[in-house]
UniProtKB/Swiss-Prot annotation:
Electron transport keyword on record: yes
Family: Belongs to the thioredoxin family.
GO cellular component terms listed in the entry, alphabetical order: cytoplasm; cytosol
Domain of life: Bacteria
Family matches, as PROSITE patterns: THIOREDOXIN_1, THIOREDOXIN_2
Organism of origin: Synechocystis sp. (strain ATCC 27184 / PCC 6803 / Kazusa)
GO biological process, one term: cell redox homeostasis
Key words of the record: Disulfide bond, Electron transport, Redox-active center, Transport
Keyword Mitochondrion: no
Protein name, per record: Thioredoxin-like protein slr1139
CDD domains: TRX_family
InterPro entries in the record: Thioredoxin, Thioredoxin-like_sf, Thioredoxin_CS, Thioredoxin_domain
All copies of domain Thioredoxin, residue ranges: 2-107
Amino acid sequence: MSLLEITDAEFEQETQGQTKPVLVYFWASWCGPCRLMAPAIQAIAKDYGDKLKVLKLEVDPNPAAVAQCKVEGVPALRLFKNNELVMTHEGAIAKPKLLELLKEELDFI
């Protein structure tokens, strides 16, 4: 499954009531670290898309989701499992560290 870009209007529908865990990647077009992290997010969406829904949300045009998830900086990650926020991370991280974080909550990583 590919990375799905969403907006404030789609946030609730795409993150709540899902059968799979949902990873939301918050980013900004002006953010250098976001550009560095993007390939890792795309790879995770490709490698685990059958078991993990991966969403991408640009922060500037979508302030409601940013406020709801208490995003204080970008890049940022939020992992939802069974409609609950179970993991948060702010700042760029390499793919191996990201997989480590996800492994704490997801048994298929």
